[in-house]
Amino acid sequence: MVKIGVLGLQGAVREHVKSVEASGAEAVVVKRIEQLEEIDGLILPGGESTTMRRLIDKYAFMEPLRTFAKSGKPMFGTCAGMILLAKTLIGYEEAHIGAMDITVERNAFGRQKDSFEAALSIEGVGEDFVGVFIRAPYVVEVADNVEVLSKHGDRMVAVRQDQFLAASFHPELTDDHRVTAYFVEMVKEAKMKKVV
């Protein structure tokens, strides 16, 4: 069974754990740097990205997270987690982990649309997935090596680049575990490659 970590500094940690377990993998709440060694994949949950960055800095997680990103093990960022994975953030000079060749805008759906739900069609996952958007970012631009998995209107809301997956919405806040299951499959495939 693959072991998937959920970064436990802030955000929808418990809901991600439930979704990972419902998808047939073991979930670990990561609160210490050395736990990164023990997992096969990592979820960066939604939350408030500036608060999360402050906590990442406080507990000296940034370099270990960048090292994890270079290790070939899959990472999945939802909402604030997508912001952490992006190489370029509109209005900000520096990236956080900066693992994905994407440009992201924070709070991109505007204050009047603080939160809403939308039925999404997601490549590799299926139709009618209810995306829960809460002060959500979205992907403004992608490099050629990034696959766009889903759009809401003309805005890119789910993308994949090799072992990295990012979503604007919160898949863990529904009882539909298909997006988490898709990530679990990515982790299984990456683990199989390492074994060979």
Curated annotation (Swiss-Prot):
Residues binding L-glutamine: 47-49, 106, 134-135
Involved pathway(s): Cofactor biosynthesis; pyridoxal 5'-phosphate biosynthesis
Highest taxon listed in the record's lineage: Bacteria
GO MF term list: glutaminase activity; pyridoxal 5'-phosphate synthase (glutamine hydrolysing) activity
Keywords for this protein: Glutamine amidotransferase, Hydrolase, Lyase, Pyridoxal phosphate
Catalysed reaction, written as an equation: aldehydo-D-ribose 5-phosphate + D-glyceraldehyde 3-phosphate + L-glutamine = pyridoxal 5'-phosphate + L-glutamate + phosphate + 3 H2O + H(+); L-glutamine + H2O = L-glutamate + NH4(+)
GO CC term (a single one): glutaminase complex
SUPFAM superfamilies registered for this protein in UniProt: Class I glutamine amidotransferase-like (SSF52317)
Active site, per annotation: 79, 170, 172
Cross-referenced InterPro entries: Class_I_gatase-like, PdxT/SNO, PdxT/SNO_CS
Gene3D superfamilies in the cross-refs: 3.40.50.880
Lyase is among the record's keywords: yes
GO terms of biological process kind: glutamine catabolic process; pyridoxal phosphate biosynthetic process; pyridoxine metabolic process
EC number: 4.3.3.6, 3.5.1.2
Self-association and partners: In the presence of PdxS, forms a dodecamer of heterodimers. Only shows activity in the heterodimer.
Function: Catalyzes the hydrolysis of glutamine to glutamate and ammonia as part of the biosynthesis of pyridoxal 5'-phosphate. The resulting ammonia molecule is channeled to the active site of PdxS.
Family indicated by similarity: Belongs to the glutaminase PdxT/SNO family.
Protein name per its UniProtKB record: Pyridoxal 5'-phosphate synthase subunit PdxT
Name of the coding gene: pdxT
